[in-house]
């Protein structure tokens, strides 16, 4: 039997992709705890200037990722997903190394933008697994894969803070580059893909991509859902520590309590995502998506009325369990509605919407809290998610009616 006849071991690829998403998630979040401190070390002084530059270096990565994702997705559909994973991991490793050598804030800002341009490991990992896994296991596989990035993002800040305290700020960037290099090597030696390159002339143009979708309006609604999920998550991030301090009063361990409450949704998502993904394979990802959105609304509203940090922590844990089902359900529905030929671009478009949400959410949360107080953020966010639940339900209902008419 020739190598081309040997079946792809998608379970091994899933394991390697999970490790890759874990390492990239950890690498991205390793530097987050001390980002403002590094900005200050690069010569930025004054409260206002420090806030402005910290916000810029944080958000510029997502902005440039949103711009670049469709290009990399198209290239993945032409050249293959594995090569895009390798490009992303190696490119980010080099940029992280250079960040540790930055001498001024402008160099650092440019490198943060370059990090966004060269990213894309997670959407390409999703596209690779989505095109290899059996359709009846898509929900479980994509749910499991999502826990890789979540796990890395949970452990990254803790490890980054400890490493920065032990070795200083710059060495953490070098350690992060090493982590990404390990990700590159794992992908290079253990990921298998059988891909027939497509010439540029044979590639579908954007209109043809839209025309090839089984339900373009539904796919657009899924992109919007991804954006709103990130807006809802990000809107709470800027005010969480301050809200916890307001609830807790004068306590000595406010940082620890805030850290715990910030991390519990991720822990809950780790536990729920594979299980709810598997349930979605049985009963349909549509039901999982709508149910999780409605539960999210019902949990966000009481968050504005809690009286203690622990009440907030319990509600955020339950919210994390519901949120763990959302992105895998969206990705599974994207798999159902797009062919393998355009999977790279569809997942990259979805990533662009996710990045826009990552930028928009914190801005929305900060603006609402400045005008109306912390508690209003939860009510407005609940309203946004409720709108999305109704919009998604309507899009899915129309899809069912279209299928019934056929």
From Swiss-Prot:
Predominant localisation class: membrane
Record GO terms (molecular function): transmembrane transporter activity
Keyword Cell inner membrane: yes
Membrane-spanning residues: 16-36, 56-76, 90-110, 113-133, 144-164, 171-191, 222-242, 254-274, 288-308, 317-337, 376-396
Compartment(s): Cell inner membrane
Keywords recorded for this protein, A-Z: Cell inner membrane, Cell membrane, Membrane, Transmembrane, Transmembrane helix, Transport
One cellular component term from this protein's GO annotations in UniProt: plasma membrane
Signal sequence region: none
Pfam families: MFS_1 (PF07690)
Superkingdom as given in the UniProt entry: Bacteria
Membrane topology according to the record: Multi-pass membrane protein
HAMAP family xref list: MFS_MdtG
UniProt record similarity statement: Belongs to the major facilitator superfamily. DHA1 family. MdtG (TC 2.A.1.2.20) subfamily.
Protein name, UniProt field: Multidrug resistance protein MdtG
Organism for this UniProt entry: Citrobacter koseri (strain ATCC BAA-895 / CDC 4225-83 / SGSC4696)
Gene coding for it: mdtG
């Amino acid at each position: 039997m020739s190598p081309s006849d040997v079946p792809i071991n998608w379970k091994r690829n899933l394991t390697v992709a999970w490790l890759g998403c874990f390492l990239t998630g950890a690498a991205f979040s390793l530097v987050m705890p001390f980002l403002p401190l590094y900005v200050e070390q690069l010569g930025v002084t004054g409260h206002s200037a420090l806030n402005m530059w910290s916000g810029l270096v944080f958000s510029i990565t997502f902005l440039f990722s949103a711009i670049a994702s469709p290009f990399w997705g198209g290239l993945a559909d032409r050249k293959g997903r594995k090569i895009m994973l390798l490009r992303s991991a190696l490119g980010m490793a080099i940029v992280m190394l250079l960040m540790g050598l930055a001498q001024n804030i402008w160099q650092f800002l440019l490198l943060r933008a370059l990090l966004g341009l060269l990213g894309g490991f997670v959407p390409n990992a999703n596209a690779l697994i989505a095109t290899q896994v059996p359709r009846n296991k898509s929900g479980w596989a994509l749910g499991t894969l999502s826990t890789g990035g979540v796990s890395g993002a949970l452990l990254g800040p803790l490890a980054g803070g400890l490493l920065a305290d032990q070795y200083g700020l710059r060495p953490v960037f070098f350690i992060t580059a090493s982590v990404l290099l390990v990700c590159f090597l794992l992908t290079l030696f253990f990921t298998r893909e059988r891909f027939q390159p497509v010439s540029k002339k044979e590639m579908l143009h954007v209109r043809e991509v839209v025309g090839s979708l089984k339900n373009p309006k539904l796919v657009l609604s899924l992109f919007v859902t991804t954006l709103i999920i990130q807006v809802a998550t990000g809107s709470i991030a800027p005010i969480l520590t301050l809200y916890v301090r307001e609830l807790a009063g004068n306590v000595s361990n406010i940082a620890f309590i805030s850290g715990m409450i910030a991390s519990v949704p991720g822990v809950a998502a780790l536990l729920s995502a594979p299980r709810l993904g598997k349930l979605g394979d049985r009963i349909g990802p549509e039901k999982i998506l709508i149910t999780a959105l409605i539960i999210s609304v019902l949990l966000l509203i009481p968050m504005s009325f809690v009286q203690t940090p622990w009440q907030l922590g319990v509600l955020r844990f339950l919210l994390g369990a519901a949120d763990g089902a959302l992105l895998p359900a969206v990705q599974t529905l994207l798999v159902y509605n797009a062919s393998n030929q355009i999977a790279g671009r569809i997942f990259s478009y979805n990533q662009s919407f996710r990045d826009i949400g990552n930028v928009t959410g914190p801005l929305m949360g900060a603006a609402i809290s400045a005008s109306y107080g912390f508690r209003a953020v939860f009510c407005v966010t609940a309203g946004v998610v409720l709108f999305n639940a109704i919009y998604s339900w309507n899009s899915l209902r129309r899809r069912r009616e279209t299928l019934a008419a056929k």
